[in-house]
């Protein structure tokens, strides 16, 4: 049930009846303060200006045409022409009942789309580090939300599995007579990579051999392809352990690395030349874009093939977008890549549009994010100044959560404690990131993320168990409760019910904008409203059974909404804490 969409349509029709144009925007929003009702229509200002009348006068005319019978108990004009809408308690009660009767909590399904989501994208032959965390968990929250809404989601893990580094690695493995790469662990590969790079930079003979191996690999030589596959396999096996620990839905089947697009690149360059978009410039093949200017104010040249015949990331990204539209039949493509790549992506997509590879009707969206910073406001590093490995970060999260949980539950059995520590520790790391607006940098702080107060995973997980504890004490007859009516008389009951029914609106925003922090803010607010409701509206000691059952049903929908909301974020809930 999307109340905002329902009210928007009702207000829009009333505005048209009052003389507004058919494309008028009612701007119905959730009210910021209870005295302004549950919703507020703010669109009268802009429309009244076009019609040459006072906003309040337009609002008065709109009210004469606005039929919210059975939806609102009161509608009033405030200030210069805002329309405040107070939802009818009977309407709230009816829709709480409907939400409880539905596995989807009354959430409707929009028109189904095929949506490709590009996220995580670690490099082969390197361990995942904290720089991969944001893309991986923000992208996964978007995927979970879109799938819940009923879309066909194609996860695309665009791993770095191609390029000159593979010539180096294979040459170094061979030099060390360790061709049997399958028995190596990734930590070894990282060491190999460093050694190979050192030799590549210092030993011209070795560098030449590495370059030859790249050519052989790219030409499809079976021995080199097999060595390359081993390197990819070791990496992806290790990464899968990290994905599983993070409770992320990516699998090996979702890998669509750079190598997938490599065979397409010569054809792309030839086609761009044939279309007159790409030209030769100083030996390289370049596309000049009017939308981007260089320092001299001239159209910027984007290289798609180097002098030596090599291709660039831009060429791969052009092929990638083309493939996602033509082969995967995407209706929409989302990229969870950090903000530093924005211009690069915009240039690749400008070429894609000019070439007609992806029509304008298919959005290509860069859902960029900021950096993860330490308490000092600088990029998050180890004490020695190195890159923090993701596995090490998760180990520390688990260890800290273990201590925290053991302190609060000294008698808890070891296996139960481990399970709880895992849910709290991993949940804390993920939620701390997801609860921040992805477009900004955020400070990584263990103390804040593991706190039981504020907008944190431990607080949200505890809030969920607190609601469940009501049911443990209540000794409920499920059938009797299901048949009982919901009755809303108190203000706090109405406020909680209205917020519960805004779950679909929240999901819709997350799906449209790729902003999981909006879901975190909603769930945190919901937990706070339940806390106030629980304090002021006795449940188990209510004045009669009818009120008791009605309040139990509000508690029941709160628990289900918290669980489902946290699930769309990939945060595990627990029964006890």
Curated annotation (Swiss-Prot):
InterPro entries: aa-tRNA-synth_I_CS, Arg-tRNA-ligase, Arg-tRNA-synth_N, Arg-tRNA-synth_N_sf, ArgRS_core, DALR_anticod-bd, Rossmann-like_a/b/a_fold, tRNAsynth_Ia_anticodon-bd. GO terms for molecular function: arginine-tRNA ligase activity; ATP binding. Its EC number is 6.1.1.19. Disulfide bonds: none annotated. Transmembrane segments: none annotated. It is an enzyme of class 6 (ligase). This is Arginine--tRNA ligase. It comes from Shigella boydii serotype 18 (strain CDC 3083-94 / BS512).
């Amino acid at each position: 049930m999307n109340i905002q969409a329902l009210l928007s349509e009702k207000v829009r029709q009333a505005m048209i009846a009052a003389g507004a144009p058919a494309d008028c925007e009612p701007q119905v929003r959730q009210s910021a303060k209870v005295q302004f009702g549950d919703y507020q229509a703010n669109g009268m200002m802009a429309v009244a200006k076009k019609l040459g009348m006072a906003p309040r006068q337009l609002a008065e005319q709109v009210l004469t045409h606005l039929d919210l019978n059975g939806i609102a108990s009161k509608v009033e004009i405030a200030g210069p022409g805002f329309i405040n809408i107070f939802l009818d308690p009977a309407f709230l009660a009816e829709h709480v009942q409907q939400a409880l009767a539905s596995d989807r909590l009354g959430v409707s399904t929009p028109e189904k789309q095929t949506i490709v989501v590009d996220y995580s994208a670690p490099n082969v032959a390197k361990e995942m580090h904290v720089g991969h965390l944001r893309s991986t968990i923000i992208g996964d929250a978007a995927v979970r939300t879109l799938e819940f809404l009923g879309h066909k989601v194609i996860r695309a893990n665009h791993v770095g599995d191609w390029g000159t580094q593979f010539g180096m690695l294979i040459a170094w493995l061979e030099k060390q007579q360790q061709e049997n790469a399958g028995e190596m662990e990734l930590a070894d590969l990282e060491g190999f990579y460093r050694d190979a790079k050192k030799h590549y930079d210092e030993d011209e003979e070795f560098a030449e051999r590495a370059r030859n191996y790249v050519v052989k690999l790219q030409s499809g030589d079976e021995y080199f392809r097999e060595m390359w596959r081993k390197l990819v396999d070791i990496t992806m096996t290790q990464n899968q352990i990290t994905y599983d620990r993070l409770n992320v839905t990516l699998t090996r089947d979702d890998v669509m690395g750079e190598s997938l697009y490599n065979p397409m690149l010569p054809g792309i360059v030839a086609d761009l030349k044939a279309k007159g978009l790409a030209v030769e410039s100083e030996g390289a093949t370049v596309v000049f874009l009017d939308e981007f200017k260089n320092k001299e104010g001239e159209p910027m040249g984007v290289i798609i093939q180097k002098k030596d015949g090599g291709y660039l990331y831009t060429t791969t990204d052009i092929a990638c977008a083309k493939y996602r539209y033509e082969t995967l039949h995407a209706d929409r493509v989302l990229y969870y890549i950090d903000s530093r790549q924005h211009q690069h992506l915009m240039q690749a997509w400008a070429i894609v549009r000019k070439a007609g590879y992806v029509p304008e009707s298919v959005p290509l969206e860069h859902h960029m994010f900021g950096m993860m910073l330490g308490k000092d406001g600088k990029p998050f590093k180890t004490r020695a100044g190195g890159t923090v490995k993701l596995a090490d970060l998760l180990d520390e999260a688990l260890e800290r959560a273990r201590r925290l949980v053991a302190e609060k539950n000294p008698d808890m059995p070891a296996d139960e404690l481990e399970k709880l520590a895992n849910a709290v520790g991993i949940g804390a790391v993920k939620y701390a990131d997801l609860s921040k607006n992805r477009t900004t940098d955020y400070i990584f702080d263990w103390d804040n993320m593991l706190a039981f107060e504020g907008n944190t995973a431990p607080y949200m997980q505890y809030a969920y168990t607190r609601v469940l504890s009501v049911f443990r004490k209540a000794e409920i007859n499920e059938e009797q409760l299901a048949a009982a009516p919901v009755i809303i008389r108190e203000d706090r009951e109405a406020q909680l019910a209205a917020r519960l029914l805004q779950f679909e609106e929240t999901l819709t925003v997350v799906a449209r904008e790729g902003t999981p922090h909006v879901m975190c803010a909603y769930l945190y607010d919901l937990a706070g409203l339940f806390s106030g409701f629980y304090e002021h509206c006795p449940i188990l000691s209510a004045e009669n059974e009818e009120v008791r059952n009605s309040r139990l049903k509000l508690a029941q929908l709160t628990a289900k909404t918290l669980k489902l909301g946290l699930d769309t974020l990939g945060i595990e809930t627990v029964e006890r804490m």
